[in-house]
UniProtKB/Swiss-Prot annotation:
The protein's name in its UniProt record: UPF0260 protein YE2365
Annotated Pfam families: CxxCxxCC
InterPro entries: Puta_zinc/iron-chelating_dom, UCP006173
Family (UniProt): Belongs to the UPF0260 family.
Organism of origin: Yersinia enterocolitica serotype O:8 / biotype 1B (strain NCTC 13174 / 8081)
Length: 148
C-alpha cells in the first residue's frame, strides 16, 4: 500500500515549515513587480523582476536575507495567503488551498524544475532585471486571464 504525499494528507495549516517551503515550485512569479493604480487599486502585472532573482534559475540569490535586502519582498504564510489574490492558478499554495492537486510538472512530482521551465510556467522567458528598467510602465504585461 502506497502512502499519499504530504500535500494530499494535510491542509496548508497542518504542514511543517519544510513541507510548506517545498510546495514552492520556484517559478519566480511572486518576484515580478506589480503596479497598483492608486485610484482603483487595480493590479498591473509587469515582467520586472526583483534584483535578487536569478533570471536563469528563477531562484532568489539571497533567500535568507531577502527581507533585509528588499523591503518590498513579500512572504507568503499560512495566515496571509488568502490576501494574495494575484497568485497564478499554477501556484501550489493556491492549488492546495483550493483543494486541488499539484500539476504533473511540479518539481515535487517531476523530480526537477526542468518540466516547469519547459511548460513556460516560470518567468525565465519574460523577466528583466529591475535595475535595468527605466520606466516600469513600459513593462506592463497584458493582464493574465487568471488574474482576479
Amino acid at each position: 500500500m502506497s502512502q499519499l504525499p504530504f500535500w494530499q494528507q494535510k491542509t496548508l495549516a497542518e504542514m511543517s515549515d519544510s513541507e510548506w517551503e517545498s510546495l514552492c515550485d520556484g517559478c519566480g512569479q511572486c518576484c515580478l513587480n506589480k503596479l497598483i493604480d492608486e485610484d482603483t487599486d487595480e493590479i498591473y502585472f509587469t515582467n520586472v523582476a526583483c534584483d535578487q532573482l536569478n533570471l536563469k534559475t528563477c531562484q532568489c540569490r539571497n533567500y535568507e536575507r531577502r527581507f533585509e535586502l528588499e523591503e518590498d519582498c513579500i512572504k507568503l504564510t499560512r495566515e496571509n495567503l488568502v490576501t494574495f489574490e494575484w497568485l497564478p492558478p499554477t501556484c501550489a499554495y493556491r492549488l492546495i488551498g483550493e483543494g486541488h492537486d499539484l500539476p504533473k510538472w511540479h518539481p515535487l512530482l517531476a523530480g526537477s524544475k526542468s518540466a516547469m521551465h519547459g511548460e513556460r510556467i516560470s518567468v525565465r522567458h519574460i523577466a528583466v532585471r529591475e535595475s535595468e528598467v527605466i520606466d516600469w510602465q513600459d513593462h506592463i504585461l497584458n493582464k493574465p486571464q487568471w488574474a482576479r
